[in-house]
Amino acid sequence: MIGRLGGLTLCASMNASGGPRHLVSCYHEVVPRDQQSGAVAEAFASLVGPHVDDERIPLDRAALTIARTEYPDLDFDPYLGRLEELARCAKARLPRVAEPGETIAALNYVLFEQEGFRGNREDYYDPRNSFLNDVLQRKLGIPITLALVYMEVARRIGFPLFGVGMPGHFLLKHYDVEGRETLIDAFNRGAIVTARECQNRLDEIYSGQLPLQPQFLLSVSRRQMLTRILNNLKNVYRAARNLRKALVVVDLICAIYPRSPEDVKQRALLRYSVGQLRGAVEDLEEYLKMSPDASDADEVRHTALSIRRSLATRN
């Protein structure tokens, strides 16, 4: 039997006569959680966990911690220094008292004209587009990571920006002293965009089937922004069937939302898929504690019991 929970297929191997073995018998060993990835998750949790106020989350350091899932020995200092350097260049182009339009123009000149940052349209799903160190080095990114660079450079010159998580695209928003909003598209060289242009973008992505809603242009929290980066990366890894890397990413999502039943369940199923049975059953049982009346509770309970029985035979 092949079981599916939360969109993930659970493997069941066949015995010699062609019948199904026990659900978990296709795993011949219990694979422990990687210590290095566990350390990255702990470091990430210290930056973004529920104990941290959202506005105090350091987006630059949190994004570089995500990059440590791929580059475990990554030194943050050169990349933080690079952001400082970009900010100094932008500030040098500003008058003592700058209007928002002047600041946006200075940021756009430094990032896109002088430095040559651009959207990676040729290889949009390259995982490196989601790692801040790679984006700063290669000067290539996707909308959300280019927005993060733009946002962090702007912050360093005292120009506050907020993320806007429009479906299928990511923008930035600035509020002037009178509360008027300006939308900025970092993926398209810092262009200032209108609501009509946002609708045109949705029409391109969704073939005219998704009308622009006011909530699409609301500011998102820092946690939401980091979660979107992680979801992008998770989807890239799952599409490539690299479940081990997808698991490391979901571990970080759970660091942001440790009480999210769906994220805990998804981590359980990824742990199961890579043979981390003890971690899988612990997550499934935690999911049941958080969502005892979930529609799939019986199926999850049966799977957890099957794993417990399999583990007991190995002791």
Region roles according to the model:
Residues M1-C11:
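Extreme N-terminal basic, low-complexity initiation segments
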Residues T9, S13-A16, H22, C26-Y27:
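Short, positively charged and aromatic/hydrophobic N-terminal segments
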